[in-house]
Regions:
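Acidic donor-binding loop of glycosyltransferase active sites
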Residues: 261-269
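Conserved N-terminal ligand/cofactor-binding loop architecture of enzyme catalytic domains
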Residues: 16, 20-92
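Conserved donor-nucleotide binding/catalytic region of nucleotide-linked donor-dependent transferases
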Residues: 309, 321-339, 356
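Active-site and donor-binding regions of nucleotide-sugar-utilizing enzymes
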Residues: 65-156, 167
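Catalytic binding pocket for nucleotide-activated donors in carbohydrate/polymer assembly enzymes
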Residues: 275, 279-321
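C-terminal alpha-helical cap of glycosyltransferases
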Residues: 340-356
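A nucleotide-sugar donor-handling region in carbohydrate enzymes
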Residues: 143-196, 200-203, 228-232
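Donor-nucleotide binding loops and adjacent catalytic segments primarily
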Residues: 191-262
Length: 356
């Protein structure tokens, strides 16, 4: 089970899959590797992603758009990355595992490189953790590619027509499922009658979250903020001294499933794993000023599927929240669509994979 410590979504999905495998196949040996085969490379990937998204997100978006718009450019960089990752991963698969699953795009490329050279005899699966599929996610030499939506599958097939691409259930923790909002509010200390918006910018808390919080508050909602590992953001928000009925701030916490269940709406600037988790829990998702690249692309595709709303500006955030507060029927429609998305059976997909 391969992932990489770039953000938290890739690792979170890998841990869920590994846990499910151990439950389904107790006699199997399941190994988890949270890295790309080189500590230095992992540090570079992690730090460069974090710095770029905080300081120059538009630069990240330009790079993303370049790969999507110019397939030949993407294929060149894919070939370089796959060769480097393949050589680094070779020792990890030297004992011939029966199944290798990857939740990180470049790691999947390394597996494809090994397969082409006859050095990966077992089955391989690439699990796409974003709704939007950029070229590095899809490799024809990987046995299966799992995507989240039919539109994601179609996008992946357009990138690599020879790839076996399927729509698969989201790899999310079992705790993200429709639950008792009143009980969750009691457990988390939130008022039963408040309109609660859970605000997150991913594990790194990026996406201009402070100003997004202002927009949420202007809409008349209580903002419950997940600052993640961004301690500076947490301290700045706490320093405002607002009463808890207006603003609650959490740093890194293991209570995210409870907080999602307690919320009326989950608002994210980053998209990715938290949006998938919210949908699995039956909560409406609001993409607010989504970050360039995968955030913006994923937001548009999720909204097109009827699973979310997109607010390009902070003014849109305020207007949309006011509208949702006044429109319980619209909220119910979004929640019902989310529940339909989350009912797919991940265990069944894994059993089917093992039977092939």
């Amino acid at each position: 089970m391969l992932s990489a410590p770039v953000g938290e979504g890739h690792v979170a999905a890998a841990r869920v899959l590994a846990a499910r495998m151990r439950e389904l196949w107790p006699a199997a040996e399941v190994r988890e590797v949270e890295g790309t085969g080189g500590p230095g490379r992992d540090r570079l990937l992690r730090s460069s992603y974090a710095v770029t998204m905080r300081i120059a997100p538009r630069l990240y978006g330009l790079g993303y758009d370049l790969l999507v718009a110019h397939p030949r450019v993407a294929e060149f960089f894919k070939a370089v990355a796959a060769a480097r990752l393949g050589r680094a991963l070779a020792p990890l698969v030297a004992d011939g595992p029966d199944l290798v699953v990857s939740t990180y795009p470049m790691t999947s490329g390394g597996l494809a490189w090994l397969r082409r050279r006859g050095r990966l005899p077992g089955r391989s699966v690439a699990v796409v953790t974003d709704v939007a599929v950029h070229p590095f996610w899809v490799w024809a030499d990987v046995d299966q590619t799992w995507t989240l939506l039919p539109a994601s599958r179609d996008q992946a097939r357009a990138i690599a027509p020879a790839a076996d691409v399927r729509v698969a259930p989201p790899a999310v923790d079992r705790r993200f499922r429709p639950g008792d909002r009143a009980a969750a509010r009691a457990a988390t200390g939130l008022a039963p009658d408040a309109f609660v918006v859970l605000v997150t910018g991913g594990s790194l808390g990026f996406g201009g979250l402070e100003r997004v919080v202002d927009a949420v508050l202007a809409g008349g909602a209580q903002a419950v903020v997940l600052a993640g590992r961004n301690d500076r953001l947490r301290r700045r928000l706490e320093a405002r001294g607002l009463p808890a009925e207006r603003l609650v701030v959490h740093g890194w916490t293991d209570r995210v499933p409870e907080l999602v269940t307690a919320s009326d709406v989950v608002l994210t600037t980053a998209g990715g794993m938290i949006a998938t988790e919210a949908l699995a829990a039956g909560r409406p998702v609001l993409f607010a000023t989504p970050v360039p690249g995968h955030g913006r692309a994923g937001a548009e595709m999720t909204a097109a599927a009827g699973l979310a709303l997109v607010c390009p500006t902070r003014t849109d955030v305020t207007t949309t929240i006011r509208g949702l507060i006044r429109d319980p029927a619209g909220m119910a429609r979004l929640a019902a669509a989310a529940v339909d998305f989350g009912v797919a059976d991940l265990d069944a997909a894994l059993r089917d994979l093992a039977a092939r």
